[in-house]
């Protein structure tokens, strides 16, 4: 959105428009979904002025009013579904990972949560006819789990048809049987994954803001950001805020972080995939004592909640625990050297 457009909002002159753009609010829509306190702090303007600007931006962007159910249905046609390339899992999830939503995957260590983030960082780059979204990926890494070598394995592990279609889509010459061609393709996949390591919870929150800027820069390019992975969402919050005395502050910061991520999904039609750690409830005498970290804040904010469990060997059980429009259920997949594969 051009700066002159922002100046048409009440109370926005050239100086204020500059502050808004510098703070990442360069469109009506990005201003419309901001809170008055957030806009006031980042753009250094009064809270009353910020409220007026936000209300005017909502009118200009047609955001925040009531819609009919049919209008919502029409808008939902724009939502993308990212295939896991595993029919059983895709069927469980109603077609795959949904954009404009937060999908949480939780499970014990070694269950394969990071493997899912790597695989979907590859799959999102596939052409739509192959189940991808033809877009790039942002990867916020809080546990030092991102491995380029794993991306290499998973690209090579794609079906021949998907590899051929990807070469054509990127207008790359060569054969999938040629090692130099595959190396070049792997490099091209890696170039479209933007990785940042989060050193603590404050840095992780800052990286979400940077991710919004990066997604905005790529919005009108050939490779828009269609997937944002956070692996893991809760590790730093869990380590830094210990005990009941700090629980309220932890949950407040986690809540803000989740809403920042959701905003990216809404603004840029991006799928948000977060992994979560678990704890064991010693008071549970019946059923599975494994519980996800994050409490009700994360439970309410996640649109889709997946519990990943180990089974025999390389088998993993993908259990859909919560979804607004899908029944609970399970699917089985395998975690192999070539990536995630059907049973």
Curated annotation (Swiss-Prot):
SUPFAM superfamilies named among the record's database cross-references: P-loop containing nucleoside triphosphate hydrolases, Rad51 N-terminal domain-like
A Pfam entry, by short name: Rad51
Chain sites annotated for binding ATP: 107-114
SMART domains, per database record: AAA, HhH1
Keyword Ribonucleoprotein: no
Keyword vocabulary terms for this entry: ATP-binding, DNA damage, DNA recombination, DNA-binding, Nucleotide-binding
Record-level Gene Ontology MF annotations: ATP binding; ATP hydrolysis activity; ATP-dependent DNA damage sensor activity; damaged DNA binding
InterPro entries: AAA+_ATPase, DNA_recomb/repair_Rad51_C, DNA_recomb/repair_RadA, DNA_recomb/repair_RecA-like, DNA_repair_Rad51/TF_NusA_a-hlx, Hlx-hairpin-Hlx_DNA-bd_motif, P-loop_NTPase, RecA_ATP-bd
Keyword Transcription regulation: no
Deletion phenotype: Decreased growth rate, loss of homologous recombination, increased sensitivity to DNA damaging agents such as UV light and ethylmethane sulfonate (EMS). Loss of maintenance and/or replication of pHH1 and pHV2 (but not pHK2) replicon-containing plasmids.
Source organism superkingdom: Archaea
GO biological process, one term: DNA repair
Membership in a protein family: Belongs to the eukaryotic RecA-like protein family.
Function: Involved in DNA repair and in homologous recombination. Binds and assembles on single-stranded DNA to form a nucleoprotein filament. Hydrolyzes ATP in a ssDNA-dependent manner and promotes DNA strand exchange between homologous DNA molecules. In addition to its role in homologous recombination plays a critical role in maintenance and/or replication of some plasmids, but not in plasmid transformation.
Name by which UniProt lists this protein: DNA repair and recombination protein RadA
Gene that this polypeptide is encoded by: radA
